[in-house]
Amino acid sequence: MKKLLLFFVVIFSTSCFAEWKMFVNRDGAVKLYYNAENIEEKDDIYLVYVRSYFAFEVPLNQEQKYRVTEAFIELDCIESTYSTLKTDFYSGYNLTGLFEKKVFENPEKKYLSRRNAYWRLAEIIC
């Protein structure tokens, strides 16, 4: 029994066991979740993992299409801004087919607006 438990711990990463909470559902076409267990906070600035699931393939370039992204974002509750620090692109819904990782050295700060999906996340976290 211990070997079986160890097998599952090794096979599945800790992110699989994290508490992912939905904060956007656009008629099933796009669903966004945030990792509620691993939020880091310092002086009203939050670091959060966000997963986006698309019901359709989204073109990244002419050759590659993705269905899931996992982004690590910085959410500033004082300035009402967010920055994407890194993004991983997957072709499969169960986070398989990782084909590109983007890490942003100097991430651009973008202001939150009601039209932006992260506005809802800011309402929850801030």
Question: What name fits each language-model region?
Answer:
Residues 16-126:
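N-terminal secretory-pathway/extracellular module detecting exported/lumenal segments
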Residues 4-13:
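Sec-dependent N-terminal signal peptides
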